[in-house]
Amino acid sequence: MEKKFLDILVCPVTKGRLEYHQDKQELWSRQAKLAYPIKDGIPYMLENEARALSEEELKA
């Protein structure tokens, strides 16, 4: 994912910053404790498409 897109995208729940995790193909919102999937290069920024981040993931 290109940095210019990360600068534009925000969490739809908190409007906060997102972190790109290339290994999992996800965008993480630590504030919302959600991970939004990226499928075929397209981020799915819907709350019902996101998965909850575990406490271990949040500490990493």
Curated annotation (Swiss-Prot):
Q: Where is the signal peptide?
A: none
Q: What Pfam families does its record include?
A: Trm112p
**Coiled-coil segments on the chain, per record:** none
InterPro entries assigned = Trm112-like
Q: Which domain of life is it from?
A: Bacteria
Q: Which Gene Ontology cellular component terms are annotated? A: cytosol
Which protein family is named in the record? Belongs to the UPF0434 family.
Which HAMAP family has this protein been placed in?
A: UPF0434 (MF_01187)
Query: What name does the UniProt record give this protein?
Result: UPF0434 protein NMA0874
Q: Which organism is it from?
A: Neisseria meningitidis serogroup A / serotype 4A (strain DSM 15465 / Z2491)
